[in-house]
Amino acid sequence: MEETNQDNPYNLPVSLTTLGECAFQNCTGITRVCLPEGVTVVPRYAFATCIKLSGVVLSKQTATIEDWAFAGTALTGISLPATVTSLGDNVFHNCSELIGVQSYPTTAPAITATTFSHDKGTIKEQCRLFVLPTASSAYDSWKNYFKAVVADLTVQ
């Protein structure tokens, strides 16, 4: 996609079901995106280095977030719907503004050692993971990547 300098939410067509790899990579003007309900996969590099992207609403049908999907963005938080089963390598690499991740799956999605990587360790120093109280122990493998795990979400 061509670079856009719009400083507002990017409205995707509700009929959209598939994003291509690198679909919005380097679109520096996008600040917020709401993915339509038909989108189940956020592909590799889909929003990588969209340096002003601070907010994303994932489809309630999202199952997979692939490698580097949100790397280098300005995301401050993200809510993973209950349907998410996996997050790839470096999904949130160098997302230095990320302070909160809400994860609604009752079974922790599969992640890699680099899903929440940051060159300076900022994510671990400042970011909290919020999960359902009944799912807290399912996220034991995630604890090393966050400042704290808070079990206080309510079912969506």
For the regions a language model picked out, list residue spans one by one.
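Structural signature of tandem-repeat unit edges
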Residues: 1-18, 28-41, 51-64, 73-86, ...
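Consensus positions within tandem repeat domains that build extended binding/scaffold surfaces
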Residues: 20-23, 43-46, 66-69, 88-93, ...
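Short, aromatic/basic amphipathic alpha-helical patches
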Residues: 114-120, 137-151
